[in-house]
Amino acid sequence: MTKRLDADDRCPVRDGLYMPAEWVSHERTWMAWPCRAEPWGSLEGLLRARVNFAAAARALSGFEKVTMVVRPEDHDEARLACGRGISFAVFDIDDSWMRDMAPLFVTDGKEGVAGVHWRFNAWGNKYHPHDNDAALGAQILDALDMRSYEGPMVLEGGSIAVDGLGTLITTEQCLLNENRNPNLTRQQIEERLAIYLGITRVVWLGEGLEDDETDGHVDNIAGFAGPGRVLIHKPPNDGGYNDRVMKDNIARLRAARDARGQPFEIIELPEPGHRDRHDGRRLDMSYINFCFTNFGIVMPAFDDAADADALRVMQGLYPDRRILQVPSLDIVEGGGGLHCITMQQPSGTPLKPERF
């Protein structure tokens, strides 16, 4: 069943809140220590991923506070691996993709910050159990003593990109997928994004990268570089799946307008060379899957010839930001990237919880 917003319902947009862009000032970045071997295919794969997670946490901590969510039984190992400068929050978790488990933070554009925790079903019930991950967003907001709103649909942070000015980019493959919100129409999904994130324009791309088990998360193919500017995963011009999909997505972006009615400036980042995962599916490497930090950017390196090209593009876009590349192959082996394992909390004072 679907629920319409009633006149007396409390929601972020009625409280003057909206989701800001990722490049605004951060209070911290949230991460989660890897604990499920299944995405990496083996315990050895999980252990290699932990090395990459720890390196990413250390890189991020050079710019801002990093809080690592960790299971009680993994706390000592995680602290030893990450070293100084990382704080830890102990929760029961099932997996480590913080972008999709964490709340989406909203702000009043001044000092106040609140959060929206959405329903989570492990990317269409692909992994079990996931009850702890589904509860994590609300638990984080409770631990922060921050006002919390419950988003009335399944939504993962990696499935959307926002510019903080009312524009949101997503994919039809993910948000319209029957394994997410089968009882919601496109219009009803857009209404919920408007009400809970302050979105006034949704730009619908088509599909994501080949063999993406998240069903086309946008954070592997497109993201805002700034107001009116979109970074896009470059079509490889080989006639393959990614080539076809990304040419279609670029055509959609060129035809679209943002919430201000302006066209997008499109900047391409190269596609790394083809590699396969442990299970034979394509390894979805993407330079789009990077993290904004305070005064910097942390982006992936794949031991690929395109690493240097991607870095040059980013340095040209952000001459005033310090840009670090960190090894990410063993993260991507599990199905996600640097952006997928992080969630930014914008700077500000937590709005106090209200009982409604």
Name these PLM-found stretches:
Residues 2-356:
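The feature marks the mature, well-folded catalytic cores of soluble enzymes
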